[in-house]
Amino acid sequence: MTRTYDPPCVMGDESIMSKKEHGTSHVPVQTNLRWNCDRSTADRICNFNRHYAEHSGYWKSTSFLDEETENGQNGKEINFYDSNTGKLLFTAPRGRSFEAFVKESMAHGWPSFRDDEVNWEYVRVLPDGETVSVDGTHLGHNLPDRKNRYCINLVSVAGRPKDENGNIKSDL
């Protein structure tokens, strides 16, 4: 199915997901993913996959809720980084409470982001709804209901940012 999505969604094309040195990406996933996400699962979904996802509810089996609930309930936004490159892809919750973010994510089975939570500098949506990073990381899919809703694999956004020297930060 080919379609376009309304702004602020930024469309991309198939060339983003062309074959590169490591599947659809230039690099494999980072070795020390956040929230105890499984690196093997992450590498398979991020770099060698176009249609599959981590199983529904996988994100609840990680340490995400244990580690982030206090921050979220205190009104702090959570940054989600590309598991390959460490680039900032999503920041949530924005324009809603942490509880609303978790409730929607629980209802759909994957972390669910809205337009205001997407960093459009690094995220693109392909005409079939596949949501990817500009570097070729498979993230998930746009499944619009009332508005655009991005159901994203936690293993795809469990990366760590890089410091000013390009080194992966070990703590956040």
Residues of each region from the PLM?
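Flexible coil/turn and secondary-structure edge motifs
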Residues: M1-L172
